[in-house]
Amino acid sequence: MSVNVQKSKSLGLVSLFLISLFVTMVSTAPSVMAVNETSSGTITGTETWTGVMNMDGDLLVAGGAKLIINAGTTINIPADKNINIQGSICAGDSSCGASQASTGSPIRFIWGDPAAPAPNQTGRCYVTGINNPDMACGSGIYLDSTIDQSLTRLNHVTLDGAYGIPVDIDGQGSIKYGALIFDGASLSVSNPTFRDINTTNVLAFNGASPTLDGGTFQVGIDEQGYHGAAIQAYGAGAGLVVMQVLNSAFTGEETDCGNQGGGRSAIYLENSFVNMDTLSITQNSYGAFLRSSSGYLTNSTVTTKCNAIDTNSHLAANGQTYTFVISDNVITPTDGAGITAYDGAIVLAERNTISGSAEGSGLGIRSSFVTANYNTIGPIGGWNGLWIYGESDVSAENNTILNTA
């Protein structure tokens, strides 16, 4: 994105707006190895931030440039401003030139609260195609597909109070938001923490395949309906390198189930392939939702109010179909189903422990292909251990089903 999400598309109003998010900056060329110099505008060389850095506008790290952020640094950012990385950012990782961050010495990006708007005043996202009036809209960190992946690392980084940046992910007006955006970018992010994010913590698209390890994530908190899953991925991880979410914890809000409840999944994937291992999803309405997606969910604990793991259809790419593997998990929805496989999903569920489901079944299968082996299902308070309907192809062997309604 220069910043246009679909470079082959002609510029529309939304694309022009997105460019304005990043490019309407006063450009200054810092000296080589500058320290805490560029508070807004463009970094074109190498700059190091340490201690406290107070930004006063949008920042662009240009292609070929490098921003180094040392351990313990606090970056204060105005409410609706963002950082766009087209070159590289090395935050808290000694392998790329920064001092090593840790739990006791993290790097903190803190966005301020917006000023109270005057009558009829709107924020920078109130343009045709987006129409979001929030005064904080547009804040976050954007990692472009042009980044130097060999020099880019994020370690023990906290994003606090970002609203999220709106992005047209397909050039057709499909606007999604993210506080930390991976636009075709694939890099390692270790021990990230997200706090008070209005929309979505992480948005990955355009073939992005980041590895997120040891993270603390929260479902969006926006009260005007813009809140989203903690992680959203569209067309991510479908190449030779898959997207990974490892050793991470997710929390949110336990709203009522159903379309009127307003709840969001902790993880939402569409047309993506993602490896998820050793996750904890608790205190939220829904767990993970995979639409036309595949991958792995293993060695995890999913405790939700509504459905824990939803799948709809499967990922198909390059003439191949891909299975979603759900294995060795403890799955405990209070009211909803443990696992659903709907409308062409291809699922292998093995060695899971599923219980709860006061208003659902352990596995709900409709018009899908499911292999379920060596699972322990029950007690189930709602309906059945396995509820199969439609023209489904199901193989279930060596399961233990007990105490169903």
Report the location of each language-model feature.
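Beta-strand/loop edge motif enriched in small/polar residues
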Residues: 29-405
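Secretory targeting signatures
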Residues: 1-34
